[in-house]
Amino acid sequence: MLHAEQLTCIVDDRPLFAALTLSLAAGELLQVAGDNGAGKTSLLRILCGLARPESGVVSWQGQPLAKVRESFHRQLLWLGHKPGVNAALTADENLRFFFPSSRLQQRESALAAVGLAGYEDLPLSQLSAGQQRRVALTRLWLTDAPLWILDEPFTALDATAMETLTRRLEQHARQGGSAILTTHQPLRPLRCPLRTLRLGGDAGGGQ
């Protein structure tokens, strides 16, 4: 599905990781771990095609990303460490922006799944940081993208929301989807394949 070969990333003359190779198959989850500054977000951005590595190649379905970028991005859901929502819009308006062909019932069901039933018409500026994060994560209930790349998706979530997100990740994997995520929180045992890639120490990475 997704493959990265011999990736090297250097930021401000400092190597974050070198000669890093990874593969992600359908139905698999990959947790990227490491201390702050180890290069977790940089790696995710490279895998998304949002940044270039110093060296190395990222491939999607056996083709270099540079050759299939448009097709790849149609099959990718990327959530950065910031919510990426418009605080001036309502929860429903934000979801309509991301999914213009979605139906109101679908959006309401997705918001209910993350514990935000009845919040459809509230401006996000009136919601807490955790609630805004949940609005952003609602996209996981509306997308049909097979590949999710998520940077710190558990940030600002309470225990109930964390459990809801964990169950959604398991469901996605059971349906043949894949996900790469970073998180500072230890994941509870999952009912799907989970591997860990740790960055740091020797500026490299290992699985």
Task: State where each predicted segment sits.
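Conserved ABC transporter NBD signature motif
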Residues: 53-72
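Q-loop/switch helix immediately C-terminal to the Walker
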Residues: 82, 87-103
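Hydrophobic anchor residue at the start of the ABC signature
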Residues: 137, 176
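Catalytic Walker B motif of ABC-type/P-loop ATPase nucleotide-binding domains
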Residues: 148-152
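Helix-to-loop junction immediately C-terminal to a conserved catalytic motif
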Residues: 48
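Conserved ABC ATPase signature
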Residues: 123-128
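Conserved ABC ATPase "signature" region
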Residues: 105-119
